Amino acid sequence: MSRLARDAAAALRRGLLATRRDATAAASTSAATVSRGRRARAVSTTTTTSSSSSSSAAVDARDADADAADEDAWETVVGLELHAQVAADTKLFSGAARQYGARVNANVAPFDAALPGSLPSVNARAVELATRLGVALGGEIHRASRFERKHYAYPDLPHGYQITQRRDPIVRGGRIDVDVGAGATRRLRIEQIQLEMDTGKSVNKTGGGGGGTTTTTIDLNRAGCALVEIVTRPDLRGGEEAAAAAEAFQKTLRFLGVGDANMEEGSLRVDVNVSVRRRGDGGDDGAALGERCEVKNLNSFRSIASAVRFEARRHRELIARGENVERETRSFDPANGETAPLRREQTLDYRFTPEPDVPPIVLSDEYVAAIARDTPELPDVAIRRLADVRGDHALPLKLATAVATHASTARYYEAALSAAKRSAAPRDVDVDAAAVARFVVGELTGEVKRASVAGRVEPLLGLPARLSPERVGELLAAVAAGETTARMAKARPMGWRDVVDALFPPVGDGEGGGEGGGDAAVEAMCRDIVCGMPEEVALFKAGKTRLMGKFVGEAMRRTNGRADPKVVSRALTRALSEEV
């Protein structure tokens, strides 16, 4: 069959799938033309930058139509590989800091750059967090796990190999329940969880003009960061389930404190393995699966769903033409919703060899038991418990889900509610659990983030004593009791704004200010502002001093207008003078 004939047959099949109707040969030709026009319009939309969001919607709609057409005949089978950075302060095998957004190559130890003579040393915190994840997901914790070298050449991998745990991982087995909609769940089995080191980052820049050359620069800040790779069984059916499963893992990683799992920062990256089979062939154990293809480095839930839908349709079209699906690794372009080949899997030989410089990780039964005692419940368990109508203080499901975003938030809410009930008992008033929850996940969390007084990943973890759940509970009990406050020379009942003002007094107003207003919180906030606005800082130092107003405005926004502008201005001046 000529290439032209094959292309015509493919276009004909796309037209039939899109219109869902039988046709004669003449009508089929017309349908193929319609399909090509629809496809051209969808691709054309993606080339217009001002309508990127509508183009994504068009791509999604196109994929959904094609999926629906073959829904009765074919089944899409998906497995996931998730790579999540763990929340250790330093890297897996070196003492360099793990810090997103740092200056290029600022956090690189000799081992990260593969300098001769440098040796790895395992990060105990990374081992602890990987063990916690395995315990929470019901996996078997290996008492002895081993590292090995996975060899391949890439510019952002200076060693020429990645240290990983393919054959003897720290965790085998486990499961997670995925909400697939309409009140149904699917149990997704986990093959293994392994520790491995991350690669660096390649940044490609193309010069101006039509014939501009592409320059690749390497940032090794990420190289060597500790990753947990979660490999699942092919238990998912379709793109929406794959996206829902990735979201469930993200919530779990955050809730357990294993990592922040921010896809936009690259601290959670997802690969999908996609195959198709005729409906009714094989069972859940993967029998009679078609050949699979892997799509790498998906960084949003929408991209996961779209990539799976496109791959499934591509596989069905190949089979319909009598062609074989080749096992290969592919990339995904979110602009047009299509995948493209990266490499054929048969050509790869990673030459796995034992890692001679890292001894096995040996865990005692006592160590695993201690971690199991400290491991919190999974998010779905916490949500069910908080929303259980049989309890004394059941929350609406949406509010319970917000409270269970982090284990620390759930613990804080329950401690604040308990303190509020104790404080309200002598006053003979009832405390509304939902009101406490709304304050904790709304006002309190927002103010904590603006004031930068806690961690970025878990905002209610490690708060100062003045923000303890006991104090918050007592203040909320006073609100419930209708106690009054005098502001503007007029007494009125206390409200949430008064609670916020009591918890967050004006910054730099006598709290450690000292001479020059050197309040530690203001200083830290101003340094954070300067670090987060490098372009403005460069312009400021080049003579555009009016930008000081922008820095002060950002500080006032973060403190909700309660900071003293003079104190902030002095702190910003010091921070700008320290910035190199």
From Swiss-Prot:
GO-annotated molecular function: ATP binding; glutaminyl-tRNA synthase (glutamine-hydrolyzing) activity
Primary site of residence: mitochondrion
GO process annotations (BP): glutaminyl-tRNAGln biosynthesis via transamidation; mitochondrial translation
The EC number(s) this enzyme carries: 6.3.5.-
Spans annotated as Disordered: 20-64
Annotated SMART domains: GatB_Yqey
UniProt key word Zinc-finger: no
Coiled coil: none
Location in or out of the cell: Mitochondrion; Plastid, Chloroplast
SUPFAM superfamilies found in the cross-reference section: GatB/YqeY motif, Glutamine synthetase/guanido kinase
InterPro entries found in the cross-reference section: Asn/Gln-tRNA_amidoTrfase_suB/E, Asn/Gln-tRNA_Trfase_suB/E_cat, Asn/Gln_amidotransferase, Asn/Gln_tRNA_amidoTrase-B-like, GatB, GatB_Yqey_C_2, Gln-tRNA_amidoTrfase_suB_CS, Gln_synth/guanido_kin_cat_dom
Keywords from the UniProt entry: ATP-binding, Chloroplast, Ligase, Mitochondrion, Nucleotide-binding, Plastid, Protein biosynthesis
Annotated Gene Ontology cellular component terms: chloroplast; glutamyl-tRNA(Gln) amidotransferase complex; mitochondrion
Extent of Low complexity compositional bias: 20-35, 42-59
Reaction equations catalysed: L-glutamyl-tRNA(Gln) + L-glutamine + ATP + H2O = L-glutaminyl-tRNA(Gln) + L-glutamate + ADP + phosphate + H(+)
Subunit comment: Subunit of the heterotrimeric GatCAB amidotransferase (AdT) complex, composed of A, B and C subunits.
Physiological role: Allows the formation of correctly charged Gln-tRNA(Gln) through the transamidation of misacylated Glu-tRNA(Gln) in chloroplasts and mitochondria. The reaction takes place in the presence of glutamine and ATP through an activated gamma-phospho-Glu-tRNA(Gln).
HAMAP family: GatB (MF_00121)
Similarity-based family: Belongs to the GatB/GatE family. GatB subfamily.
Additional information: This protein may be expected to contain an N-terminal transit peptide but none has been predicted.
UniProt name for this protein: Glutamyl-tRNA(Gln) amidotransferase subunit B-2, chloroplastic/mitochondrial
Name of the coding gene: GATB-2
